[in-house]
UniProtKB/Swiss-Prot annotation:
Subunit and partners: Binds microtubules.
Biological role: Plays a central role in chromosome cohesion during mitosis by preventing premature dissociation of cohesin complex from centromeres after prophase, when most of cohesin complex dissociates from chromosomes arms. May act by preventing phosphorylation of the stag2 subunit of cohesin complex at the centromere, ensuring cohesin persistence at centromere until cohesin cleavage by espl1/separase at anaphase. May regulate kinetochore microtubule stability in mitosis, possibly to sense tension on mitotic chromosomes.
Disulphide linkage map: none
Source organism: Xenopus laevis
Protein name per the record: Shugoshin 1
């Protein structure tokens, strides 16, 4: 086809088209810019809103802070006001309290003043009444003081009464009573100098009597009893004469205990102690002591004399006026002291002996021993109740360091081979007896171990074996002991020595003969084929070859009935399951039964030595948590069985929280 040519456009048209296109492009660009501006505006607006909110929050916070400060200031001011008011309140309360105190003190003063005024009035009235009574009693005193024979004229008495009444009326109120009394009436008091002197004498006398009483307990006084009583009588007679000259009959002349003590203890001059007639003391008569008091004082005196027979000065002084009573008491005290001199000495000796015994018992007594024995019925036989308790062996291996002490361990942990307690008690008693004999003996000292060995070397009694720690050591020790026993028996039985070749032949013959005799005698079915077993078993041949030195021929019995003696190590080397070993053991038992009438103790422990390398189970110890084989077989290390695993799988389907089957 022929291509049609497009019409050509003019230059202007093309320019217009280009302009239009450019305009469209601008519009599009503007539209795009407008959309971008819108998004930016929204973002800016969001940012502006957040900032404004923050500003608002800050403003609010500042306002709140200011308000809080203002309120705090107000509260502080209020608290200050409250404190000020409280102070004022306390001050007012204190003032009120002080005012109340003043009021109470004023009221008390008023009452005290009123009481004092009333008391003064009462005292004035009493003094007035006393003066009146004194004036009335003056003529009666004059009547009493006048002589008994001379009776006064009534006119003189009336004159004296009238003069005394006029003197009383003229006296002032403040005059003392002692001034108003006449000179003949003596008051019941001494002058101060004489009173002080008498008090001093009494105090010294009391001190001296106390010293004499203390000294009389420890040592004898050198003064004699008769001089003491005579001195008492002299004092009493002098007092009687002087008082009769100065005092009337109705005035008592009895002295107190203190004045008597002055006479007894102090060697004071009687002229100084006696008072003139003008200054004598008028005392009201006191009743004599009752019978009860006198009896009590006598018993006290007797007790004192018994306690201190060597002190004759210690006598109870009674306030009696008569000297005869004092002498009688002194003589009674002397008689009782002479009678009871020997009795307190015997009592003292007994008391001293009892005290010494108590001290010795208290020193010997131990703190863990009971002071009182337990009460038991007499009907019970105490000897039967007492049981022989085996004494505990002392641990002699103390301070031995870290080494393992077999003897100490054996004494603590008793093995099953030590269950025969009777033999132990017998051995202990024999050891105690031997030790006591050894102490008394003057022979040479032998150690304890030698004695025990010599006692245990009897052929009939087998030694009690200790608990073996290693099998080889025990086998070696047993073999040595057996060899020693055999050598002793051989020396006693036959002193001749036989060569090895002769021993081989005789041992083979005797061994076969003994087997035949044992087969005839025995009733056990297991020991019938012993001869065949011995003939066929090569170990027995080796045994018979090896233990030539151990076989001993006993010459006490005839050669046909002779039995071989084999050492313990050869027996233990045989295997445990062979019939030969059983046969040899039975032969040993039979031979021992023949020799000793008492049945010998069978061996409980058969030691077999195996020289093969021990297994793990043999090396492991029972009870040791580190090497115990049973501990490894505990449920922790066991493999779980199928049943347990199935049960656990079935149970695992269930949830712990929700009890239901999982699907």
């Amino acid at each position: 086809m022929v291509k049609e040519r497009c019409p050509k456009q003019a230059f202007q048209d093309s320019l217009e088209d280009i302009k239009e296109r450019m305009k469209e492009k601008r519009i599009k660009k503007l539209a795009k810019v407008a959309t971008v501006n819108k998004t930016l505006c929204t973002k800016v607006q969001i940012l502006n809103s957040g900032s404004t909110a923050i500003k608002n929050y800050k403003a609010n916070n500042t306002a709140l802070a200011l308000a809080l400060e203002a309120e705090k200031l107000k509260t502080r001011q209020a608290q200050d006001l409250i404190l000020g008011l409280k102070r004022e309140h306390q001050r007012l309360i204190f003032e009120i309290f002080m005012l109340r105190r003043r009021l109470q003190s004023q009221q008390g003063r008023d009452t005290a003043e009123s009481k004092l005024a009333s008391l003064k009035d009462i005292i004035a009235k009493v003094t007035h009444n006393l003066l009146e009574t004194a004036s009335l009693l003056e003529p009666a005193h004059l009547l009493c003081s006048s002589a008994n024979n001379n009776t006064p004229n009534p006119s003189k008495v009336e004159e004296k009464l009238s003069s005394g009444a006029s003197a009383i009326l003229r006296l002032p109120s403040h005059a003392p009573i002692s001034d108003t009394l006449p000179k003949n009436v003596i008051p019941n008091r001494l002058e101060p100098e004489q009173r002080n002197f008498k008090d001093k004498v009494v105090l010294e006398a009391n001190r001296n009597t106390a010293g004499v009483n203390r000294q009389s307990r420890g040592r004898r006084s050198h003064s004699n009893q008769p001089s003491f009583t005579s001195r008492l009588e002299e004092c009493n007679n002098e007092d009687k004469t002087e008082s009769g000259a100065t005092m009337n009959k109705n005035v008592s002349l009895r002295r107190r205990a203190s004045s008597l003590n002055i006479c007894l203890e102090e060697s004071l001059p009687l002229e100084d102690t006696n008072v003139n007639s003008e200054h004598t003391v008028v005392e009201t008569e006191r009743p004599f002591p009752t019978e009860e008091f006198s009896n009590e004082s006598r018993t006290d005196r007797e007790i004192d004399n018994v306690d201190n027979p060597a002190s004759p000065l210690k006598v109870k002084c009674f306030p009696h006026a008569n000297g005869s009573k004092m002498t009688g008491l002194a003589s009674e005290a002397k008689q009782t002291s002479n009678k009871n001199k020997e009795e307190p000495r015997v009592g003292r000796e007994r008391v001293k002996k009892g005290k010494a015994e108590r001290v010795a018992v208290s020193q010997m007594k131990k703190p863990w021993e009971n002071s009182k024995p337990r009460a038991r019925s007499k009907s019970r036989d105490r000897s039967a109740s007492k049981k022989s308790v085996a004494k505990e062996k002392m641990n002699s291996s103390l301070n031995s360091g870290d080494a393992f002490d077999f003897a100490c361990e054996e004494s603590i942990h008793v093995t099953p081979f030590r269950q025969n307690k009777q033999e132990e008690s017998q051995n202990e008693s024999s050891l105690e007896i031997s030790s006591s004999e050894g102490e008394l003996d003057d022979s040479l000292y032998k150690p304890y171990k030698d004695k025990s060995k010599n006692k245990n070397l009897k052929p009939d009694i087998a030694p009690v074996p200790l608990r073996s720690r290693s099998k080889r050591n025990t086998a070696r020790k047993n073999s040595i002991a057996e060899n020693e026993l055999m050598s002793d028996v051989q020396a006693e039985a036959n002193e001749k020595k036989i060569t090895r070749n002769g021993l081989k032949r005789k041992s083979e013959n005797s061994f076969t003969e003994s087997a035949e005799t044992y087969r005839e005698k025995s009733f056990m079915p297991t020991c019938i084929n012993t001869n065949n077993a011995i003939a066929e078993n090569p170990e027995v041949k080796v045994f018979s070859d090896e233990c030539n030195g151990g076989i001993i021929y006993t010459a006490d019995e005839p050669s046909g009935a002779s039995t071989p003696r084999i050492s313990l190590s050869d027996v233990t080397n045989l295997p445990g399951n062979t019939d030969a070993k059983k046969h040899i053991n039975l032969l040993f038992n039979e031979d021992e039964m023949k020799r000793s009438s008492t049945p010998s103790r069978k061996r409980r422990c058969k030691v077999s030595i195996n020289y093969a390398e021990p297994k793990l189970s043999g090396k492991l110890r029972r009870g040791d948590p580190f090497t115990d084989s049973e501990f490894l077989q505990s449920p922790i290390f066991k493999n779980e069985s199928k049943r347990n695993s199935l049960n656990r799988q079935s149970l695992s389907r269930y949830n712990e929280v929700f009890v239901g089957c999982r699907r």
